[in-house]
Regions:
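Active-site-proximal segment of RNA-dependent polymerases
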Residues: 80-142
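Short, compositionally biased low-complexity segments
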Residues: 2-16, 49-53, 80-86, 119, ...
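Conserved, non-catalytic sequence blocks in retroelement Pol enzymes and Pol-derived host proteins
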Residues: 27, 99-100, 157-161
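Active-site-flanking structural segment that lines cofactor/substrate pockets
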Residues: 33-62
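Conserved pre-motif C helix in the palm subdomain of viral-like polymerases
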Residues: 62-92, 137, 181-204
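Conserved polymerase palm-domain catalytic core
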Residues: 41, 114, 118-204
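Non-catalytic, polymerase-adjacent accessory regions of viral genome-replication enzymes
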Residues: 1-36
């Protein structure tokens, strides 16, 4: 069962970078009542993900971004606070995305060290292969990801809220925001998107 204190922890973690947003401000006006309601909804399995907003970013390439409501972001942080420490125990050291103490700068620094080592201090040729996964997020098979995460939680997570965490992970992963969202950008020509990376926006 999820308790108020752990939901409060997720709320405080969530608002660190979102406190100035309208959604965060509205939630904060009655945050105790709102957190109690959110906690009760999770425990009774009545929680449902709200409408996301969808907008287009143009740099470094055209892509759609879905942003959840503030209360849904609290749930995301609730999940992340439990899974991130476990992921850190199994991730390869060369995984740099979305990890504390890693990121782009750490990745570039490691790459420079690798090039220096492979080229024997820049005295020999060394080759670098740059690759990308086309339409990565759009092509994820949600059911397979949900099972992988559920198996991971069952094996590694030991908290009293294990069943709640399993339920929330499945709910969030299987959610399809493109079916219920508010558009915040004008339509964009399909040709501007990389192949496989459009779900909502297209000029009709």
């Amino acid at each position: 069962m999820v308790d108020f204190e752990t939901m409060l922890e997720a709320y405080l973690d969530c608002r660190k970078r979102k406190r100035s947003t309208v959604g965060a401000t509205e939630f904060e006006l009655n945050y105790v009542r709102n957190l109690v309601e959110l906690t009760n909804e999770v425990n009774s399995r009545q929680y449902r993900i709200g409408k996301s907003i969808c907008f287009v970013v143009r740099y470094p390439r055209y892509r759609e971004v879905f942003a959840g409501q503030f209360r849904d972001r609290i749930i995301h942080h609730y999940i992340a606070l439990r899974l991130e420490p476990l992921f850190e125990q199994v991730f390869c050291d060369r995984t740099y995305n979305c990890r504390k103490g890693k990121g782009q700068l750490a990745g570039v620094t490691q790459l420079a060290e690798d090039i220096r080592e492979e080229s024997e201090n820049y005295t020999q040729d060394a080759y670098v292969m740059k690759v990308d996964l086309k339409g990565f997020f759009m092509s994820i098979i949600k059911s397979e990801l949900a099972k992988m995460i559920d198996d991971f939680v069952v094996e590694y997570y030991e908290g009293d809220d294990k069943e709640d965490l399993r339920w929330l992970c499945n709910l969030v992963i299987m959610h399809r925001p493109e079916l219920y969202c508010e558009r915040r950008s004008p339509p964009v020509d399909v040709e501007l998107y990389p192949e496989g990376e459009i779900a909502v926006y297209q000029r009709r």
